Amino acid sequence: MAHLSHCLRAGLVTAGLGWSGSAMAAGIEMAEYTVPSDPGIQLYVREKHPAGVQQFGTERILLFVHGATYPAETSFDLPVGGASMMDLLAARGWDVWLVDVRGYSRSTRPASMDRPPAEGKPVTSTAEATRDVAAAVDFIQQRRGVAKINLMGWSWGTSIMGLYASTHNEKVERLVLYAPQWLSTSTVPTDAPALGAYRTVTRDATLARWLKGVPADKEADLIPAGWFDQWADATFATDPAGAKQTPPVLRAPNGVAQDSRDYWLAGKPLYQPSDIRVPTLLLHAEWDADLPTYQTQAYFSQLTHAPYKRWVEFGEGTHTVMLEKNRMQFFHELAGFLEEKEPTRSTKEPE
């Protein structure tokens, strides 16, 4: 049985695709759950929805999953500028959920993450993470009494959600893949050392990675003042053990890195996008140095059985465009795809 930790309310009001973070005219309820996955694995799941509303149709429920390094709660529910991505959607009438897979944030961390990395093998593979998503989807569908929900993944999360959707089309309404992972033109060096159970990142390294590929004259105004520190403070706080190190670090499972070596860097797809048979949106930004545009383009061409598909490329954005100055462009495209009526081919001949 899932355990409900607590529930709180916060205020938000919307106007079109805009928002007012300080307004209290409309309420948002937030609940946190512990959801079982594989034996011994407990997942942290968070939900936000309009206060007092308990019934949602399949088309108004969305689940987020994070990428390879940072947890979902500080990716999708960090109130930069006064409102998080979850807040913005909940204020529009959505029942929005996130899940942190094993090894991240408040979900169960494998025991080897409490030892030096070299003493263990890479933990949290894409297959394991997909089972965690499956557990979260089943929990949400049972709780809401629906057969399908919408899914969105970021970075490695696109592989998790893509793999899940390709094998569970009947449970997916629409699919959003933000910075999709696909076959890389890079390869694994022949002298690459074996991977440990997990890796660590520092605050300085995180900022350097964020800005990689950004023109020097564009760096200063890419991330609004205070947003990086707000995000970094919240993100590194999700790993109390790492925070005790000097300097403080964030621990991240290496299963994703091992899968990259075994599949994406070896020219072998981990799954086939052609098996996805639900409407799909790809979101990507031009300065994404982690998963460059060529991967999105190649992935888009593989979506041969989606009823309809769309690819939106954002200018002046990185792998983390969702937390940058152009985040409302991102939100506009996300909400537009999720809320539009299913496009149909017109029978009228063009004039």
Regions of interest found by a model, annotated:
Residues 72-75, 100-123, 319-320:
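Glycine-rich "HGGG/HGxG" loop immediately N-terminal to the catalytic nucleophile
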Residues 52-98:
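Short, surface-exposed "cap/lid" segments of acyl-processing enzymes
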Residues 289-295:
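Conserved alpha/beta-hydrolase "acid-adjacent" motif
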Residues 26-57:
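N-terminal cap/lid segment of alpha/beta-hydrolase-fold proteins
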